[in-house]
Amino acid sequence: MSTPEFTLGIEEEYLLVDRDSLQLAEAPEALMAACRDKLEGQVSPEFLQCQIEIGTGVCAEIAEARADLRKLRSTVAAEAARFNLAPIAASCHPSADWAEQHHTDKDRYNDLEKDLGGVARRLLICGMHVHVGLDDDDLRIDLLPQFSYFLPHLLALSSSSPFWKGQDTGLASYRLTVFDNLPRTGLPPVFNSWAEYQRNIHVLIDLGLIEDSSKIWWDLRPSHNFPTLESRICDVCPRLEDTLSLAAATQALMRMLWGLKTHNMRWRAYDRFLISENRWRAQRYGARGSLIDFGRGAVVDSTELVEELIELIGADARALGGLAEVERLREIAADGSSADRQRAVRRAALEAGQSDAEAMNAVVRHLIEEFHRDL
């Protein structure tokens, strides 16, 4: 078995807000045209007109991904500013109402709205997807259930959507609550081979129910367009460095699992019922919560789990050039994710005598500042 390249690609979805009202704003065509001109196809509209999606190129290591992602974020921010707009990288706007948004008039999105109805119209959410290059088809299928064990860990550390329509949801990642209303979501099934995966997907394709595997929206999936495994579990992160830490961890986890395979070993694939419990705990409590360590048979705080994770994948992260980024996960576990920071901003605003609406606007200003901080 040849050694995979473990190339890296990162996709992020942003919301556009008016700098004065701090409410969502639709992307002007002139803004999209300017971004397309400067970013050569690395930016595109998303389902809703207030959203914008970017994607890095194929990166050999995390340093290359950092440079590309910083360029993408900087360009979008600079072009948006020309229209008195600002991007925010949070999975839900704190106070916006999905019913007031309009979807992008493209065949793909028109078909999606027609197919999914009101479920699609509620998709006022943004995510972050990480692709890791694995050329071997069967290897990608083999790693699906093994990597799934770690999906809740990544979700907890990325959580950035505590608010929905002006209310504190009590969750760290409300985005997942909205997204799970779609069909063909959640943890991936277990397949024994690439051929078995293809047979199952083609049942739906051959019946005309879906066009292709891009309509499969599992938390982790073989990409339809690239020879990659695509992790889709994460909320989008306001801070550039948080995104890079999670991407580096995803890349190192893939290499670690491949390394086990080369020694005729594998990570235990726990039942989806059990992984789903951790997925819920991550969704509910975020980076300052706790998850089940099934090997130990105990509920363990995130700070301790992150230490275990760094020990587990540290050598692989070093080999890939991303050890510093992976070690930075300690800061997220100790200080909290964006969901914790957003709640702290709102709490401080309310304690200062601001109204609920003013407090939510303070959260949006905070998200704008965090987006621009590392640029």
Swiss-Prot record:
GO MF assignments: ATP binding; glutamate-cysteine ligase activity
Keywords assigned: ATP-binding, Ligase, Nucleotide-binding
One Pfam family in the UniProt entry: GCS2
One of the GO biological process terms: modified amino acid biosynthetic process
Transmembrane segments: none
Entry annotated with the keyword Nucleotide-binding: yes
Catalytic activity: L-cysteine + L-glutamate + ATP = gamma-L-glutamyl-L-cysteine + ADP + phosphate + H(+)
Highest taxon above the source species: Bacteria
EC number(s) from the headed UniProt entry: 6.3.2.2
Family: Belongs to the glutamate--cysteine ligase type 2 family. YbdK subfamily.
HAMAP family: Glu_cys_ligase_2
NCBIfam families for the chain: gshA_cyan_rel (TIGR02050), PRK13515.1 (NF010039)
Functional description taken from the UniProt entry: ATP-dependent carboxylate-amine ligase which exhibits weak glutamate--cysteine ligase activity.
Name of the molecule in the record: Putative glutamate--cysteine ligase 2
Organism for this UniProt entry: Dinoroseobacter shibae (strain DSM 16493 / NCIMB 14021 / DFL 12)
